[in-house]
Amino acid sequence: LTELMKCQKMQQQEVSVQDTDAVIEAVLKSMADFEGLPHRLQYVGTYRGVRYYDDSISTIPEAAINAAMSIPDAKTVLIGGMDRGINYDLLVTFIRKHKEFQFICAYASGKRIFGEVGDCENCVYAEDLEQAVEAAVQMTEPGGACILSPAAASYGYFKNFEERGETFQKYVHAFAQ
């Protein structure tokens, strides 16, 4: 009877291990197939060796900083939009400290941020998103990544963050190819 119980226990453990392997395979497949939400660090494509990401939903400085730090080999960050009068000190400090990134500022909040860090060689100003993407295509070296992460609202320039993100993607496809 003891041998029979041992045999049953071993069979149960084998089934358990097989079930675990199946679960792990299913999880890995789900992770590989997972597509994030649109405009949340959404991968746009790779052109001339540069990866482009759309984080248009980013409307605060912390989101732009997190985007820059979370994308491997991020080199260029496009920031700016409607100036709501929020405090950009955290982002200004980040720009000053992190010379490994190029920042392209646009629109009203970008103009204000650029005014605070204009003496930094890693920060330039562009009038609008079209100019910002053109500059990013020229500035971002192959092997690097470019992120639209505005740290500002889209209103006054776009209907919403979705339209801003779609416009960014359109410019990337047009200029980067």
How would you label these PLM feature ranges?
Residues 1-101:
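Nucleotide phosphate-binding/pyrophosphate-handling subdomain across enzymes
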Residues 63, 112-115, 157:
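Phosphate- and divalent-cation-binding pockets in alpha/beta enzyme and binding domains
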Residues 151-177:
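Glycine/aspartate-rich loop-and-adjacent alpha/beta segment that forms the canonical ThDP
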